[in-house]
């Protein structure tokens, strides 16, 4: 598995070696030893989540201010544009974002450590999105930053207005968001 640190170095893109022939393909989607070697520290996952969304659905930008979650994310059907925003005030990349296309075809995964907000928009007719988390969902600690915050200036690849949940429509401005030390 190839691991590439992105413009925010704590966010890592993983690309598996895929073995294919006329029967189909095989690849190792997760290897704890290789993953922790790339991250540089032990990581323990406690929950897997799976969602299905239609084209234009935008989920995010979500995070938990307590019980902060690291996430290893991938698309198992279709394609998404996946975004991580650094919310760690002490970080040299505080307030910056990175984004990557993840798809069933490219089989890429993105590691988003705790201390980041996360979101994605569906680019294909449908997408199924699978992610591992390092802590359990804690709705009382959940926060949301509005997807189109003018300070963050995320370059979402959108043709039309996204389809948002009520929670995501009510997201806070980055300037007003609870952030990490």
From Swiss-Prot:
Coiled coil regions, renumbered to chain: none
UniProt GO BP: dTDP-rhamnose biosynthetic process; lipopolysaccharide biosynthetic process; lipopolysaccharide core region biosynthetic process; polysaccharide biosynthetic process
Catalytic activity as recorded in UniProt: dTDP-4-dehydro-6-deoxy-alpha-D-glucose = dTDP-4-dehydro-beta-L-rhamnose
Enzyme class: isomerase
The keyword Isomerase appears for this protein: yes
EC numbers for this chain: 5.1.3.13
GO (cellular component) term, any one: cytosol
A GO molecular-function descriptor: dTDP-4-dehydrorhamnose 3,5-epimerase activity
InterPro entries recorded: RmlC-like (IPR000888), RmlC-like_jellyroll (IPR014710), RmlC_Cupin_sf (IPR011051)
Binding site residues for substrate: 23, 28, 47-49, 59, 71, 118, 142, 167
Active site, per annotation: 62 (proton acceptor), 131 (proton donor)
Positions marked as site (Participates in a stacking interaction with the thymidine ring of dTDP-4-oxo-6-deoxyglucose): 137
Pathway: Carbohydrate biosynthesis; dTDP-L-rhamnose biosynthesis; Bacterial outer membrane biogenesis; lipopolysaccharide biosynthesis
Key words, A-Z: Carbohydrate metabolism, Isomerase, Lipopolysaccharide biosynthesis
Subunit note: Homodimer.
Function, in words: Catalyzes the epimerization of the C3' and C5'positions of dTDP-6-deoxy-D-xylo-4-hexulose, forming dTDP-6-deoxy-L-lyxo-4-hexulose.
Family named by the database record: Belongs to the dTDP-4-dehydrorhamnose 3,5-epimerase family.
The name this protein goes by in its record: dTDP-4-dehydrorhamnose 3,5-epimerase
